[in-house]
Amino acid sequence: MDSVPSIRILTKNAVITSKYTLLKNHSKYYMPNHNLKDIDEDTVVKMYYRRFIRLRPLISRTRMVKETYTSYIRYKFKIENYQLKRKLVTGIEEQRPLIPTLQKSLEFIIKSVSFIPETKTIKFKIARDNTICRQVLKNLLTVEYQKENFIEKRSKGSELYQLLRVDFNHLVNSNNNLKFTSQLKVFNDFDMCLILMNETIGTRL
């Protein structure tokens, strides 16, 4: 029986097979090499935002996952009070510098979409690191999707949004007008673990 020939598509920007896409130019996903200290912080933050959004097509082939990722990035940059969320979990008042945490987060996402086979003959530690980043991002987006569904399907959706996305009351106690359900407990546990991971590796996921 003849084997099925592998599919390979060559474009100006990439080499595409049935399993992988090899990008010829990566520069648009990375921050420029010149000194960012000469640029005001708001402009630098916008530069990071654009690079996170550019990674969207590489996150998944599934439209739902890509849409969840886009919503997540927009929320992180435009709505979330990360310092409040961090304080509720760690008790730390002092803020971390924003730009270094964005850089670490960008590196994390780039690793998650970069594939290297895990074999002894190839750089195993790098491959394993990329795999772990990919698994964490997959879990993060799964929980983000569940949060959105949880908020949208409840009659008290706006109240849930305030609780989960603005005030983060699910991280501190169950003394609110909403029943502290098992689903809220899942969000509590995941968000606490995510914040603690950020503290460990310097990200802002």
UniProtKB/Swiss-Prot annotation:
Keywords assigned by UniProt, alphabetized: Sporulation
Coiled coil location: none
Gene Ontology terms: biological process: ascospore formation; double-strand break repair; mitotic recombination
Role, per record: Involved in sporulation and maintenance of the mitochondrial DNA. Is probably involved in a pathway contributing to genomic integrity.
Family: Belongs to the IRC19 family.
Protein name as annotated: Increased recombination centers protein 19
Species for this entry: Vanderwaltozyma polyspora (strain ATCC 22028 / DSM 70294 / BCRC 21397 / CBS 2163 / NBRC 10782 / NRRL Y-8283 / UCD 57-17)
Record gene name: IRC19
